[in-house]
């Protein structure tokens, strides 16, 4: 792992210090501020996103409205280390992968990229009147759902068939004047899919190309899911997943910073010592 500057870190959205990342760069060059920060955590509206102030990623290209690659190069030239996000648990409904799935259904190469709710829980419950499999209580009693009801978004494919997908966070469904449904939301990724693993690898490579020295693992604890286990900080799945990500990041010398949703007193950080 490359040496990281453990001095003061600036945390900011790319458009929150003057409107663009270029404005933030100019601020950091200004004499009263110059040298004050060793690193800069640029929050993920740096990328192409649509919701949740950047945490609903369409793709990891740079959002040209508020930032450009030259801004990142300028920060590195100033000796400011970059901290960037990879959002592990979910992607935007507007992502190319989910849009391909909506159009092609089972013919899509991304049919296993997201979590087919009914397939995940097959044999563990009964289908309700909406076509959603309701798991028996024994399977979900230890699970943490962030909103009332089951965490699903039922989507309609281009051929008219419907299917529920795991949706931990935001969702919205609008119907236009022609009766067509339009979706917004953050769809959970199937971390066991080879294509998702490939996507993680490519994203880490992209972030390294941007100059990231530190990568924050957003929604890390929600991503590993297993029938009969917790869906949040499950053990050992959470730590196996972290090791896998660590191995992916190793060629780039980046430090990984997992988002851990727990108080310091719980000592979960101790589980990271073996990594």
Question: What feature does the model see in each segment?
Answer:
Residues 2-195, 205, 220-272:
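Acidic/aromatic-lined carbohydrate-recognition and catalytic surfaces
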Residues 195-214:
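An active-site-proximal structural segment forming one wall of the substrate-binding cleft
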